[in-house]
């Protein structure tokens, strides 16, 4: 049985497109746990379409972001590689092509940080540069 540690998370995405910058960020609570030598972060986020459960799985050189609920998607980040994911919503789906530039992580039960820099193509649209950072601290739930 996995032992879950309550955590408080801060998720921030900076998206750059033709000189414009959009920042999306939120704070939430969730859990940290280790399973088969991989670190997992689990949390819920409010999306325009409803509640989404997100699980982030971190292993050497790879991060997998799994979303379920109002939005369904498994997005894989591998340093120096391109991956394709389907972003599924109730009214349809989009294909996302991700080219990961870098992954940095420093994780333990008390606190941690994951930073991912990647280019993303949404369908046939142009490329956008994304920088996503997830930071957390343990034991701060009420």
From Swiss-Prot:
InterPro entries: Calycin (IPR012674), DUF1934 (IPR015231). It comes from the Bacteria. SUPFAM superfamilies: Lipocalins (SSF50814). It holds the Pfam family DUF1934. Forms a beta-barrel structure that may accommodate hydrophobic ligands. Homodimer. This is Uncharacterized beta-barrel protein YwiB. It comes from Bacillus subtilis (strain 168).
């Amino acid at each position: 049985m996995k032992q879950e540690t309550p955590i408080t998370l801060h998720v921030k995405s900076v998206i750059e497109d033709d000189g414009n910058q959009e920042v999306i960020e939120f704070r939430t609570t969730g859990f940290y746990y280790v399973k088969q030598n991989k670190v997992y972060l689990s949390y819920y986020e409010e999306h325009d379409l409803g509640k989404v459960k997100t699980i982030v799985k971190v292993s050497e050189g790879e991060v997998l972001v799994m979303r379920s609920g109002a939005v369904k998607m498994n997005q894989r980040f591998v340093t120096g590689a391109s991956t394709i994911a389907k972003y599924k919503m109730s009214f349809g789906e989009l294909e996302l092509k991700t080219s990961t530039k870098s992954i940095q992580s420093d994780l333990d039960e008390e606190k941690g940080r994951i930073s991912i820099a990647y280019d993303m193509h949404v369908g046939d649209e142009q490329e956008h540069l994304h920088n996503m950072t997830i930071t957390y601290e343990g034991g701060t739930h009420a």
